[in-house]
Amino acid sequence: MKNKNVIQKMREKTPLIHCITNYVTINDCANILLSFGASPAMCEAYDEVYDFVSISSALYINLGTLTKEQETAAVLASISAKNHNVPVVIDPVGCPAIKRKVEVINRIAEVGRIDIIKGNIGEIKFLAGMDSETRGVDSLDNGENALDACTQLAKKYNCIVAATGEKDFVSDGKRGSVIKNGTEMLTKVTGAGCMLGALCAATCANFEDKLVSTTAAILSMNIAGEKAYEEAQLPGSFRIALIDNIYMISDEEIWERGNVEWK
């Protein structure tokens, strides 16, 4: 896997990532995409999304603060993505607490397309029909059976599924990876998960093996987080250091420093 130049290929293309995301972390997602080497566009008007998806490299749908207007725009955007062969990443933020979000995911799967679902372990286990522990948008789950949950959900939606926590798990229904990098400080800043979803969209835009591209995105965030914590131990300065280290991250670094178990 060390020969997979996921980040290099992404930066060579500067993919346009169309984001329909939440209002809490929209700026964070835009900035981390820019630092990573992608080009963000935060377009969510219903009358604009169909055309804009057609010129985009990937579509990132984050359900964090889902308004009715965002819901209708996201569904239409997913239809355009299906029609124009644009990969779609969905982050089901808070779905155990707000069941309507599951209906939106199922609607997108029905009329559009889903290439990657990226959530925390509690969200992914909930979507897979397993018992999970969550509080609002946060997971309290210990990660037991997380890879099984990813595998089941990947088979259900025929996509890549990533579950993040103390360890991170990725599956395409047959293959999988377990990632053991990261720092607890990533849980002390708002939007780390949302930013990771944006990175997953960037890496999958021009890379065929989306299990590998998703693993690379998670490694990028986790290792940048580790390095940021070496430089800054307080949340405000850590956030800045995280963006800086994403800017400097490379394929060589993530595969050399990455602690990944392939399944």
From Swiss-Prot:
A single MF term (Gene Ontology): magnesium ion binding
Binding annotation for ATP: 118, 164
Catalytic activity as recorded in UniProt: 5-(2-hydroxyethyl)-4-methylthiazole + ATP = 4-methyl-5-(2-phosphooxyethyl)-thiazole + ADP + H(+)
Stored InterPro entries: Hyethyz_kinase, Ribokinase-like
Gene3D superfamilies noted in UniProt: 3.40.1190.20
Positions of disulphide bridges: none
Cofactors: Mg(2+)
Keyword Cytoplasm among record annotations: no
UniProt keyword terms in alphabetical order: ATP-binding, Kinase, Magnesium, Metal-binding, Nucleotide-binding, Thiamine biosynthesis, Transferase
Domain of life of the organism encoding this protein: Bacteria
Pathway per the UniProt entry: Cofactor biosynthesis; thiamine diphosphate biosynthesis; 4-methyl-5-(2-phosphoethyl)-thiazole from 5-(2-hydroxyethyl)-4-methylthiazole: step 1/1
NCBIfam families: PRK09355.1, thiM
Family in the record: Belongs to the Thz kinase family.
Job of this protein: Catalyzes the phosphorylation of the hydroxyl group of 4-methyl-5-beta-hydroxyethylthiazole (THZ).
Protein's name in the database: Hydroxyethylthiazole kinase 1
Organism expressing this protein natively: Clostridium botulinum (strain Hall / ATCC 3502 / NCTC 13319 / Type A)
Gene from which the chain derives: thiM1
